[in-house]
Amino acid sequence: MARLRLLLRSARLLGLVALGLGLAAWVSLRERLPGADVTPLRQRLTRWWLARLCAALPFEVRVSGEAPRQPMLWVANHVSWTDIPLLGALAPLTFLSKAEVRAWPLAGWLAEKAGTLFIRRGSGDSRLINQRLAEQLHRGRNLLIFPEGTTTNGESLRTFHGRLMASALEAGVAVQPVAISYRRDGVPDAQAPFIGDDDLLSHLGRLLRGERGSVHIQLLEPIPSQGLDRAELARQAQQAVRLALFGTAAPTQTRRAA
């Protein structure tokens, strides 16, 4: 049964990848036209395609709360690469990703064509990065970041780093905290986390072979940035996500990922 699930789901996913490549190539051609601004088209197509990708993944998705109508800096806890399509299907988002993702076969190219902003961790040029992020927010675009800086197994929360929160302050926009929880058979999902030495294809294979899990996405109360510094903004966002996921007793990890 697991083998049949893998074959059927893989076939559906391959069809979606082919469709995504075709759409990305078409947008890339449109981009070359003189004076063409394809950003609105790219965001609409990206959201449409991500919604179909989510439907092909083995998750039952439940969403609490409403997506904001005005541009905000979305900050979420990070469990897996699947966080990105799940959130991207909810609203037009510009994604921020580590530079290594650009080198992933197919997925990296699709991410680039979807308008993802890539940053190199440890580059030290936080001012320039925040300027790029603030520009996106000034243009009325929602921006998604994962302030933990890495993925977790979903059973704890790492410290939210305030370095990238400065973009919300510079643009004068609120922060939209998001809590993502993966469950399977009533307990935290051990298959969903993309951590450690996982590679994309092996992780995807495990997901496609398994039974359907569940995902709960909570869009929490936005946090106004006015009057706060980036450290306090990060602390409040982290507290909101921690309370939504675990309640007051949940621990926060402070160690860096291995």
Curated annotation (Swiss-Prot):
The keyword Repeat does not apply. GO terms for biological process: cellular response to phosphate starvation; membrane lipid biosynthetic process; phosphatidic acid biosynthetic process. GO terms for cellular component: membrane. It is found in: Membrane. GO terms for molecular function: 1-acylglycerol-3-phosphate O-acyltransferase activity. Induction: Induced under phosphate limiting conditions. Keywords: Acyltransferase, Lipid biosynthesis, Lipid metabolism, Membrane, Transferase, Transmembrane, Transmembrane helix. It catalyses: a lyso-ornithine lipid + a fatty acyl-[ACP] = an N(2)-[(3R)-3-(acyloxy)acyl]-L-ornithine lipid + holo-[ACP]. The chain crosses the membrane at residues 7-29. SUPFAM superfamilies: Glycerol-3-phosphate (1)-acyltransferase. It comes from the Bacteria. SMART domains: PlsC. Disruption phenotype: Mutant shows no significant growth defect. It is a single-pass membrane protein. It is an enzyme of class 2 (transferase). Its EC number is 2.3.1.270. Pathway: Lipid metabolism. Belongs to the 1-acyl-sn-glycerol-3-phosphate acyltransferase family. OlsA subfamily. Catalyzes the second step in the formation of ornithine lipids, which are phosphorus-free membrane lipids. Uses acyl-acyl carrier protein (acyl-AcpP) as an acyl donor and converts lyso-ornithine lipid (LOL) into ornithine lipid (OL). This is Lyso-ornithine lipid O-acyltransferase. The lineage of its organism: Bacteria, Pseudomonadati, Pseudomonadota, Gammaproteobacteria, Pseudomonadales.
